[in-house]
Structure formats: C-alpha cells, structure tokens
C-alpha cells in the first residue's frame, strides 16, 4: 500500500495540467487496490503510457525516463531495456478487462494514448506490438525523436532533433500530445524464407533485427525445408548501398558506443561511412558494387491482384520500398508526380493509408542529394500493394537490407538454396500527428497536394553512369 499512497500523494500535488495525463496505479497493476486511489475520481483527459529506450540518444533516454517519472506516476513510464512493450501492454489490458465495470478504468481505456521515445526501430517495435494485440480501440501513438534519422517522428510533425529532457521540454511535448490529431498509417508485413542452409553455405549465424523474428514450426506460414522469418515495418524496407552504409554505422556503434552519444557526431560519422563504403564513388573504390538488377528478380502486385515483373535500370544500386514521406532524416524520395505523370504511369501522391507502397531507386549518394533540391526525387519505379524479391544464385555472397533503420547482412544463395522476401499490406494503426505533419491521408479533405513541375522521372538513366 505504500506505493499506492505515495503515487496518490504525488497526484494531489500535481498541477492541473499534469493531472490530465496521470493514471492511478490500480489501473496499471492488479496488485494495487482502487480504494487506495479514492481521491482520484476524475478521469484524466489524456491518459498516457510512456515507453522509452534508455539507450537511445546517448544519455538522453535515461534522463528522459527520470523526468517523466518525476512528473507522472512512475508506474506509467517504462524503460524498454528493462521490460518489453508486449508484456507491459498485455498486462495492462488484461487488468483493464478485469476492471471493465470500473467507470474510471473504462474511461482511461477509451482515452488511452502512448508515447514512445527512441529511434525509428524502437517506434516501429511499439507500433508492431499494438498492431499484434488486435485491440477493438487501439491507442494512438506519439513518437519522440531520440534516434539518428528520426524519420517516423518527422513524418508526423514531432521533429527530428533530439529533445530536451528537462521538465519544461517534457511539458511542452505533452501539450502537443493534447492537441495532436489521429491519423491512420499502413502496416507492411515482411516475410523472408531461406531454404535450409547446407554446412558451410548460407550463413547459419544470421543476425536479424528483433522486428523480424523466426516463426514457430507450428505457424501456418512455416514451410518444411525452409527457415521463415516474419515481421513488419511502417516506414521503409531498403536493399543495397544505403543499407550497407547503415550496417557499417550500426556495427561501429556496437563496437564503440562511447563515440556515438551526440546526434551531430552520429550524422557526421554516417556521412564519412557513405564515402568509405563507396556510396559516393563506386567506380573508384567499389567497382564490383552490385546493382539491384543483378541481385534479385523483383515482382509487384497491384490492388487487383495482378503480378508483374518490375524493370530495374542497370545503374540502380539501392531501392527503397517507402510508406512515409520521410527517409534518411526527413527527405522525400517519391515527391509528388505531376498530373501528366500520374495519368501516363498511373502514379499517385504518396498517401500513408492507401494500401500502396512507393518503390524508389537510387544510383548513388549524388543521386540521393537531388532530394535536397526543390521538386527533387529518386527514380520512381512503381507503386504496389505487394512486392516479391527472389535472390539469384551466385549473384553475390550477401546483400545488405534494412527495415525502419535496422540493418542486417543477408547471405544469398550459392548453390540450390533460395532466399525470398515478400512485402504485403497488413492492416493499420493510429498515429498522433501535430499541425506540422508531413504525411497525407487519402481521406482528408485538407490533403491538398502541390504538384511538382518535373517532366523527367529520373527513370531514364539506364545508360547513365557516374
């Protein structure tokens, strides 16, 4: 009872503003009794659960946890290095079900929101957990930019710079949560199958992101003779040189975490690695760098279920399957096709809830710098409801892939093995978006699209080499 009394004593001393977010302990844990919370009779207007990756942003994650726990009930603030979000949310929603006849708990369940602070991988992790719970009224999610790229927060108006961790900064963020609007976002499932590797062939020590776990043998999508991995992403899947640079960055950060405690230093290191990995000067430093067409056969499926081969120009060394208008720290690779292009190629603006994913190609980092110019964009390859990549035998020993900021080194077939990656639409979740939101919904009358004047799509580059 000591914890309950302490938490309610804190509630009594809170400002009216902070009381709008406070959740009584008995709602969060079955170990606490409601009688001890009797003074908290008014349901909070914006009850929140806060999930923070304490290792994100150098020391910022740990500092942010302390501030939130000082301002709110410490039981509603969770360190993702200590407890996983699936266990936390399952426990809380089971308790809310137990308290379904409690009017205060019911109101909190109906109004509940989530704040997640971390990199894009951390945010995607929370989104996936909420999606997997299949809740009748899933809580909308606000994202605190605590990583290096921060594409997810930027796409929904939360900024891309690491936040302050002091009381004033946190209260300012909470104020934005109150005024944020809900917006649906498409969820994309990724399924990867690898034929059982032979001794010494396809790498057995494969290290994949935690968001792409191996499925159980009893799963209906499991196939005998194959290792099958399934996960999801919300922003992008990429293949090629951009993922290779990201992999080098993550590898160095794991080896020397003390060197990566500042966002500006991280971005500078990333740029240096882009040069040394050959992303700028492939012909000079990495003449054997693989173009995508040599690595994989790619097929796309439209809304009508029609599969077609996707033509990839020989000069393309990186492709991105993109859901949000934010990549590599806020750039928009797809842009907005002009009306003529939309008619000629059946392209649309990049809505985040239309069940279509945009596929963009890049030749090199110089090509990527075009995104910094007005109306700049990558090579628009296609929009699709599903994408299938089949990797060719002997094309290369491995390829680099990345989902929502989490890269890995993928072994490729050498003999009769196969590697297949399939991306498909898999429902939606609710995000919280500020007035600075860059993402557009196909259902919003306010989604006015400004068309670019580009007449060329950067897709006529097959014979162009840097």
UniProtKB/Swiss-Prot annotation:
Q: Does the keyword ATP-binding apply?
A: yes
Catalyzed chemical reaction(s): a 1,2-diacyl-sn-glycerol + ATP = a 1,2-diacyl-sn-glycero-3-phosphate + ADP + H(+)
Concerning Pfam families, the annotation shows:
DAGK_acc, DAGK_cat
| PROSITE patterns registered for this protein in UniProt | DAGK
List each copy of the DAGKc domain by range: 43-194
- UniProt-listed SMART domains: DAGKa, DAGKc
One record GO biological process: phospholipase C-activating G protein-coupled receptor signaling pathway
Q: Which is a Gene Ontology cellular component entry for this protein? A: chloroplast
EC numbers, comma separated: 2.7.1.107
- Gene3D superfamilies tied to this protein: 2.60.200.40, Probable inorganic polyphosphate/atp-NAD kinase, domain 1
GO MF terms on file? ATP binding; ATP-dependent diacylglycerol kinase activity
UniProtKB keywords:
ATP-binding, Kinase, Nucleotide-binding, Plant defense, Stress response, Transferase
| Subunit-level organization | Monomer.
Job of this protein:
Phosphorylates the second messenger diacylglycerol (DAG) to generate phosphatidic acid (PA), another important signaling molecule. PA is required for plant development and responses to abiotic stress and pathogen attack. May be involved in the accumulation of PA during cold stress.
Homology family? Belongs to the eukaryotic diacylglycerol kinase family.
Q: Kindly provide the name given to this protein in its UniProt entry.
A: Diacylglycerol kinase 6
The species this protein was found in: Arabidopsis thaliana
């Amino acid at each position: 009872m000591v914890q309950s009394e302490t938490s309610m004593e804190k509630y009594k001393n809170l400002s009216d503003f902070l009381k709008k977010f406070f959740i009584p302990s008995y709602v969060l844990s079955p170990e606490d009794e409601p009688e001890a919370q009797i003074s908290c009779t008014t349901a909070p207007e914006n009850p929140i659960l806060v999930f923070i990756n304490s290792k994100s942003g150098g020391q910022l994650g740990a500092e942010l946890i302390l501030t939130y726990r000082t301002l709110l009930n410490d039981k509603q603030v969770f360190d993702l290095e200590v407890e996983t979000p699936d266990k936390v949310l399952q426990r809380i929603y089971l308790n809310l079900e137990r308290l379904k006849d409690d009017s205060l708990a019911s109101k909190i369940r109906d109004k509940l929101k989530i704040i997640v602070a971390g990199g894009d991988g951390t945010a995607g992790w929370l989104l996936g957990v909420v999606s997997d719970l299949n809740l009748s009224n899933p809580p909308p999610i606000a994202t605190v930019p605590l990583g290096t790229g921060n594409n997810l927060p930027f796409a929904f108006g939360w900024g891309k710079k690491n936040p302050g961790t002091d009381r004033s900064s946190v209260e300012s963020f909470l104020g934005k949560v109150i005024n944020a609007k809900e917006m649906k976002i498409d969820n994309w499932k990724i399924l990867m199958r690898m034929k059982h590797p032979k001794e010494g062939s396809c790498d057995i020590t494969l290290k994949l992101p935690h968001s792409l776990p191996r499925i159980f043998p009893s799963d209906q999508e499991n196939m005998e003779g194959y290792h099958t991995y399934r996960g999801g992403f919300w922003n992008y899947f990429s293949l090629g040189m951009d993922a290779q640079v990201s992999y080098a960055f993550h590898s160095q950060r794991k080896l020397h975490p003390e060197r990566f405690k500042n966002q500006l230093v991280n971005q500078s290191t990333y740029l240096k690695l882009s040069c040394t990995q050959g992303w700028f000067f492939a012909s000079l430093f990495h003449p054997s760098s693989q173009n995508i067409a040599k690595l994989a056969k790619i097929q796309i499926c439209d809304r009508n279920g029609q599969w077609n081969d996707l033509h990839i120009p020989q000069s393309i060394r990186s492709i991105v399957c993109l859901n949000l208008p934010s990549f590599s720290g806020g750039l928009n690779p797809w842009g907005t096709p002009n009306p003529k292009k939309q008619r000629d190629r059946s392209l649309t603006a990049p809505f985040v809830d239309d069940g279509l994913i945009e596929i963009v190609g890049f030749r090199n980092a110089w090509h990527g710098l075009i995104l910094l110019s007005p109306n700049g964009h990558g090579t628009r390859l296609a929009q699709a409801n599903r994408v299938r990549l089949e990797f060719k035998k002997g094309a290369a020993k491995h390829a680099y892939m990345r989902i929502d900021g989490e890269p890995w080194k993928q072994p490729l077939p050498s003999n009769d093995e196969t590697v297949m990656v399939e991306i498909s639409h898999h429902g939606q979740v609710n995000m919280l978006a500020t007035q600075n939101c860059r993402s557009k919904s196909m259902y919003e009358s306010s989604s006015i699209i400004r068309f670019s004047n580009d007449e060329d799509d950067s897709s006529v580059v097959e014979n162009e080499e840097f």
